[in-house]
Regions:
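Short beta-strand/loop motif that positions the catalytic acidic residue
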Residues: 115, 121-123
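Conserved alpha/beta-hydrolase "acid-adjacent" motif
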Residues: 128-137
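Acidic beta-to-alpha connecting loop that harbors the catalytic carboxylate
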Residues: 125-127, 156
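Feature representing long, continuous alpha-helical segments
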Residues: 88-95, 172
Length: 180
């Protein structure tokens, strides 16, 4: 079990996933899980540029014990998420993402043999969650199966979240790919 899931399951309000029966929500665990996950969505460069080692001003602190801006930001994001997302759904969704492996049963190259469509693989240099090397593996498997594929790595300083901020960069690539 990963740290993210464990933080939810260890919350006193989780009740083995039956928290709705007790009219509670495992907010602390869900908040911690999201804070941990959120770190992997951002890049080191983005976090350094946005927060550095700056101290949080006392007027806008989320709660006591917070010293740095990054802590305050993660607390805010965790609180926001715990108010709007179901803990069991988060566990299932992240477990599905963690366990997905296109080449698990037969290898990536063989798993691509039945693909008839052309492929566009887009990545960002700063993405820790799906680093550019994974996209290259996908394109190599496609090429070994004579699949028409394009692989593009874009600059973006927001890590995995770069696709949310640099839509102009990849929307042109997607449009060109679809119309070709």
């Amino acid at each position: 079990m990963c740290i993210r899931d464990r933080s939810i399951r260890k919350d006193k309000n989780f009740y083995d996933g039956n928290y709705h029966d007790h009219d509670v929500i495992p907010k602390n665990g869900l908040k911690t899980a999201r804070m941990l996950g959120h770190i992997t969505y951002l890049s080191e460069e983005h976090m350094d540029n946005r927060f550095g080692r700056r101290f949080q001003d006392s007027e806008s602190k989320m709660n006591k014990g917070i010293d740095f801006e990054i802590e305050n930001y993660l607390q805010y994001k965790g609180n926001q998420f715990s108010e709007s997302f179901d803990a069991n759904s988060y566990i299932l969704m992240t477990k599905a993402m963690d366990n997905y492996d296109a080449g698990k049963s037969m290898g990536l190259i063989d798993s691509f043999k039945s693909i008839k469509a052309k492929l566009l693989i887009v990545g960002f240099y700063s993405d820790w969650l799906y680093p550019p090397e994974r996209g290259k593996e996908i394109q190599l498997a496609a090429m070994q199966n004579n699949i028409n594929s394009s692989y593009v790595i874009l600059a973006g300083d927001h890590g995995h979240d770069s696709f949310l901020f640099h839509t102009d960069k990849y929307s042109k690539i997607i449009r060109k790919f679809i119309t070709s």
